[in-house]
Amino acid sequence: MSYPNRSYVEHVAVRVRDIHWHIRFFREALGMTIRAVDGDAAAPKQVWTVGGIQLVADPGFAGPEGRLAHLGVMTGDLDAALAAAYAFEGVLPLAQGRNWLQLPDGLCVEVMQATGTTVERALAIDPRG
């Protein structure tokens, strides 16, 4: 079956108590590059790696370390994706904007509009091949 809209996971956001430890781990253990920092580099609110990990500083977080904050999905047609998503029973909008959804099990998804042929190019990459 073919679906009219194509999308890919652009990032996964994870709440962490100690953002500096996680930055060091992803850099030093896995060789990942930080591509963006929100806030002062000495005390970042959040950082993004090349490859799609977003670390969100949340020092007071009471849940288990590494709690998923949200999935970020890049799509070729935002309006079509949102219409299809909201057609599912139990999908709710979130306060962040119309492109933020909460699924029935509590998972939050940020749906973003891709530019140009970004989706096609990303889906053409076979990281295992």
What residue spans do the PLM features occupy?
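Core segments of cupin and vicinal oxygen chelate
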Residues: 2-7, 13-54
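Vicinal oxygen chelate
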Residues: 1-5, 8-17, 35, 46-49, 61-129
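N-terminal beta-strand motif that seeds the catalytic metal site of vicinal oxygen chelate
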Residues: 1-23, 66-73, 115-129
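Generic alpha-helix signal with a bias toward terminal, lower-confidence helices
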Residues: 21-28, 42-46, 60, 67-69, ...
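Conserved short beta-strand elements that form part of the metal-binding/catalytic scaffold
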Residues: 33-67, 101-119
